[in-house]
Amino acid sequence: ICEKPVPEHLIKKLDDERLVPEVVSRMKADLARMGSSRVPQPAQNGHVDFSTIAWPGVSARLPEKEGLISAIRQNYPGISLDDINPRSIRDITYYIGRKALADKYGITIAKAGHIIGLLDLVIHETDDGRIEIVPNNVHRFKQLYAHKGYVSKMLKLINGKEVADEDE
């Protein structure tokens, strides 16, 4: 799974998308570089490193606490700090992840979100505040990779709550 995180039958689905052929070629070339013989190590103290199986070249910095609160309040005017939850944080982080993919390939943010789902990938927020796009089947394997990342860290900073990412 880690050597070829996106199976060929899913990659072939890109051919059916309404994308410029050059974009499909670039995506396929990048996906071919995705993966490693190094399996991500099981989570240690809530930390997991999926960088060896992340979509190459797709990364974005996530906002610090105040920037995140500001972005959430744009989506949810009047929300109190106490009412901020994992979903309201992920509304921001997932947008940032889809936008990073969209910017890399010159596609719409909606199309980027569709492609992430089409390829059975997921947006992963690292605990050091970055976005990675990783295989869903590895990310959701909680027996080895249950983790607390950016969402849990920000929630604790914003309102004192802490939720393991898998508990949402």
Tell me the role of every PLM-derived stretch.
Residues 1-122, 126-168:
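Nuclease and nuclease-like effector domains acting on nucleic acids or nucleotide cofactors
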